[in-house]
Amino acid sequence: MKPAGGRGGWGWGGGKGGSKGGDTGSGTKGGFGARTRGSSGGGRGRGRGGGGGGGGGGGDRQRRGGPGKNKNRRKKGITVSVEPHRHEGVFIYRGAEDALVTLNMVPGVSVYGEKRVTVMENGEKQEYRTWNPFRSKLAAAILGGVDQIHIKPKSKVLYLGAASGTTVSHVSDIIGPDGLVYAVEFSHRAGRDLVNVAKKRTNIIPVLEDARHPLKYRMLIGMVDVIFADVAQPDQSRIVALNAHTFLRNGGHFLISIKANCIDSTASAEAVFASEVRKLQQENLKPQEQLTLEPYERDHAVVVGVYRPPPKSK
């Protein structure tokens, strides 16, 4: 028995195969002609059930970029939420990708091009800013598991080495409108960016001075609860100590980011960190915690401690 339809005889198998080819754009079930004849503009074979015709439809779909059966499939919705971190004022965003975030003090405004996310909470929209640990030593320390940062809502913070205000802006979010962050930066170029950030954030007070000379800006700054230092200078322990003696209350806390190469490029990072800790201890700055910042920063460590701790009660 010869196939019906002469050259289009690959449609043997009836109309079922041809119609499948036309619907799905593949024509694989019983419609071999749908792929070979149809995709080359065929349809000349008339098969017993119109297999060749179904093939023509399949060829069309392929030219438009593939099977059409997934064309209108909707993407599954992703549930997003924000959870409080154990550090007060810091949050974790749960979505397509998890991220460290802070509640944006100035909704609708980003500081350094960071992503902003909006979440409905109790019927109100709340905007959060993602905090990049590759651009912030404090964020890297938090994700690295630091036990305490001592920066929380209503805190007064002295930030040494504020640069253009990337981390300062997140500290501003954490402490809220009732807190204050004094941001000290010596570079005038970075200082201009810092001032622009402070124009929209009323809890940031920019101080364009050298952190080595705290007496030059002592009239601008009151006593603070926390000092954060990211100055990357060979004498940074001395810089922190001078500012602590001038502005940090007894029992206050400090966080210092240490970049080993900036202090001694010939010694190992561990030796540099140990040396800096000894210098801090000589200045009534008692280190309580130390952690490295890998994988976010290489040869960096953050030391957290207390200044002139009160005597332990017996």
From Swiss-Prot:
Residues annotated to bind S-adenosyl-L-methionine: 166-167, 185-186, 210-211, 230-233
Gene3D superfamilies linked to this entry: Phosphorylase Kinase, domain 1, Vaccinia Virus protein VP39
GO cellular component, one term: box C/D methylation guide snoRNP complex
Ranges of Basic residues composition bias in the record: 64-77
Positions where Omega-N-methylarginine occurs in the chain: 7
Chain intervals with Gly residues compositional bias: 1-59
Catalysed reactions, semicolon-separated: a ribonucleotide in RNA + S-adenosyl-L-methionine = a 2'-O-methylribonucleotide in RNA + S-adenosyl-L-homocysteine + H(+)
UniProt keywords, alphabetically: Methylation, Methyltransferase, Nucleus, Ribonucleoprotein, RNA-binding, rRNA processing, S-adenosyl-L-methionine, Transferase
InterPro entries given in the database record: Fibrillarin, Fibrillarin_CS, SAM-dependent_MTases_sf
Superkingdom, natural source: Eukaryota
Molecular function via GO: RNA 2'-O-methyltransferase activity; RNA binding
Subunit structure comment from the entry: Component of a box C/D small nucleolar ribonucleoprotein (snoRNP) complex composed of FBLL1, SNU13/NHP2L1, NOP56 and NOP58 and a guide snoRNA which mediates 2'-hydroxyl ribose methylation in RNAs.
Record-stated family: Belongs to the methyltransferase superfamily. Fibrillarin family.
Role played: S-adenosyl-L-methionine-dependent RNA methyltransferase that catalyzes 2'-hydroxyl ribose methylation in RNAs. Functions as part of box C/D small nucleolar ribonucleoprotein (snoRNP) complexes, where guide snoRNAs ensure methylation specificity through base pairing with RNA substrates. Exhibits broad substrate specificity, methylating multiple sites on ribosomal RNAs (rRNAs) and messenger RNAs (mRNAs) depending on the guide snoRNA incorporated in the complex.
Name of this protein: RNA 2'-O-methyltransferase FBLL1
Originating organism: Mus musculus
